[in-house]
Every structure is written in structure tokens, then in C-alpha cells.
Amino acid sequence: MGLEKISRIWIPLIGILFCVVDGKSENNFVFEAEKIVSAGIEMPYRVAHTNGLGNPALVIYLHGGSSKGNDNDTQMKEAGIDSIANYLALKKLNAVHLVPQCPSDKSWGGPMLGVLKALIDRHVLSESLDNTDIYIFGGSMGGTGTWSMLSAYPRLFTAAMPVAGNPSKCDADNVATTPVYTVMGTSDRIMSVETASGFIDELNARGAITRLDIEEGWTHEVTCIQSYTTKRLDWIFGHNRNSSGIENPVAEDNIVKSIQYVSLDGRQLSESPCKGFYIERLIYNDGTVASFKIFK
């Protein structure tokens, strides 16, 4: 289950270039730095676009607890991102790949679930991703956050892969609406195999589409690093909205009604600027607003 090699070159102020170096692909793509401000919470994130086949999918990766902060850099060092990015390049999949960074005083739960939803909404709307497939991944705290997103937003995601996470506080009825593949290690001293296995049993009792791999001898760290194999990613990306029976990629209880573009000095803009700093606002049908500080 070794990871396919991928090199990472750090480019200050521009992004992160992922380049497959095993000779199988020439596809390169850059993770550019952006931020979102929603409900008074500022969250940095990275976004990359892969130019591949088919309609673009939205891919989200949630990092573990040791990568929290506001440098928009530390979260990119997790091995799972390399594995997923490499897979997208090798398979020539068309995707928008998001990697948010959780603030140091937060976790992937509570108000951060709403911030993540606003991030998804922003890219679904601004990049015309209506009816797109949305996939979510995460390890450790990010695995727990992935479970929590499935619980908070049923039918939003096409498929999910929470790794070494804790689903104990999640609503099984909601989570059961999404195909899920989870991986746990028997030597994990942080997350409980029994908790994950019991929750999978609850999902199966509700007719959910699930896979659970329990790896003998894997520690928490090893599980977070080695779980994203080609075979498992094939299973995740093999699901689409038609095959999964998912009706609507956006939760119907809070839909984006309009989008506004504003300069940093508060002037309303008629369209998104081609370059420079500006603020993008999503106006929801319940009156709430999510703001994004954008740099092009």
C-alpha cells in the first residue's frame, strides 16, 4: 500500500505545485491561496483546478489537529493531499480541489461546519458547479470532521472517506444518505476501531453504502498516511450522483440567492475583477451572508 511518488515545490505567494514524477503523467496544477470569512470566522484555504475529463468534481480534504493555524501552509504537508492530488492527475479527472485550514482555536465541528458549507457553496456558485459531484476526505480530526459534515448536510456529498475519525456524535440517519469508506488501524490509540465499526453497523442497518477496512498493526499516524490507496480512491470516485441516487448537491434549507463583488474600500463591483484583491459575498435565502477575501 505504498504511496505513489509525488514531488512538492513551494512557491511563495503563488501556490503549491504538484507534479507527478514517476513518468506516468505530465499534469501539474497549483494550489492557490485564498481565504473565506463566514459568521465572523476567517479560514484560509488552498484551491487547485485539474483539467481532465468530464464535468468538474469538487474535492475537499480536511486536515488533522496538528495542522491547525492561519499560515495557509501547514495543512498542505499532510500525505493524504499528495495521494489524492496524484490520483486526480494520473486519472486525468476534472476537479476543483479544496484544502481549508482550521483556525488554531477551533476544530472541524460546531461553527466550522457552517464555514465549510459556505466554502463549498462559494465554489459551486462561482464556478458553475451545479449538480456536480462533491467528495470529502479527512484524517484524524479531519476524519471526525468528515463524519460531522455528512451528519450536518445529508445528501450534499457524493461519497466520503473519513480516516481514523470518530463518528460517535453523528446522526446515523443523515450519514446513511452518503456512500462512505472508512479506514481504521488496530494499533490506533487515539481513535477507537470499535466506535467506527459500531457506527458502520448502524449505517448498514439503514441500507447505507459502506466500506470499512481495519488494518492490523496500523497506528493512528500510519492510518492517516497510508489509507488513500488507488483502490480505495477508485471506490470513492467511482460513485456519482446517478449511481448513488443523490438528488441535489446543495442542501435545500439554505440556498445561495445571489452573489456580490465588492472592492476593499466598499465599492460595489459589477463583476468579478480579473486581478487584484476584492471581496465576494454570498447572500443566502435566509438573509445570512458569507464573505470571501479573494486575490487573483
Name every feature range the model reports, one short phrase each.
Residues 181-183, 189-243:
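C-terminal catalytic histidine-bearing segment of alpha/beta-hydrolase fold enzymes
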Residues 58, 62-117:
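Active-site machinery of serine-nucleophile hydrolases
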Residues 241-267:
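Residue-level detector of functionally pivotal "anchor" positions at catalytic/ligand-binding pockets or at interdomain
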Residues 155-167:
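A conserved short beta-strand
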